[in-house]
């Protein structure tokens, strides 16, 4: 497969292999916008496996292409079971800085910025979601406006809804990981807390 940027699946596979080197590559979140699980399952599985093996980051995973159905999203989410991954939906519209045109892009383009804002305004163990920390200011609109029932369907499948509210704009309205079992680790902020603690302990040990 070749993505919209002309990169082949093997290009991603080679890059993923490099990221196994924890001495030279440090990060606490990874996303690969446009490389969605429905069409690039081999690559997204490799990224997830690498993320789990490293134990120091969370994979913001795109599940489906633009204009997919909720059933397709929840079905794809059902094939993943890990607290080291989180998924968001739907796609969002923003302005291309190079052309000035409106374009739809996958949610994983923006979500790491939400995490970074949470780190800067609070701490990694705060939920990167909601009106205060989950606002998507650079987003013009979501691909579709989710109903309450839509949001419930997504959240039950461990997919975090990107919701639209009057006078609030577009907001990340959930912080679940893709772990199926109900526990503290089915929350993004808990997984990120443990990642932060692991990094802190590692620095002390060094």
Question: What does each model-found stretch correspond to?
Answer:
Residues 1-206:
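A glycine- and small-residue-enriched flexible loop/hinge signal that marks low-structured segments
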């Amino acid at each position: 497969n070749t993505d919209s940027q002309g990169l082949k699946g093997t290009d991603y596979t080679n890059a993923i292999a490099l990221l196994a080197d924890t001495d030279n590559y440090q990060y606490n979140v990874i996303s690969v916008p446009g490389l969605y699980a429905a069409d690039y399952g081999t690559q997204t599985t490799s990224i997830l496996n690498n993320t789990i093996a490293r134990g120091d980051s969370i994979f913001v995973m795109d599940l489906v292409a633009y204009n997919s159905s909720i059933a397709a999203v929840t079905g794809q989410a059902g094939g993943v079971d890990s607290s080291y991954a989180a998924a968001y939906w739907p796609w969002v519209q923003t302005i291309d800085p190079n052309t000035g045109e409106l374009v739809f892009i996958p949610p994983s383009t923006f979500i790491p910025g939400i995490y970074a804002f949470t780190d800067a305004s609070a701490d990694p163990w705060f939920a990167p979601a909601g009106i205060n920390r989950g606002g998507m200011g650079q987003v013009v609109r979501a691909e579709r406006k989710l109903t309450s029932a839509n949001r419930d369907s997504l959240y039950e499948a461990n997919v975090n809804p990107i919701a639209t509210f009057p006078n609030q704009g577009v907001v990340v309205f959930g912080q679940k990981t893709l772990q199926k079992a109900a526990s503290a680790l089915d929350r993004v902020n808990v997984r990120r807390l443990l990642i932060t603690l692991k990094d802190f302990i590692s620095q002390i040990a060094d």
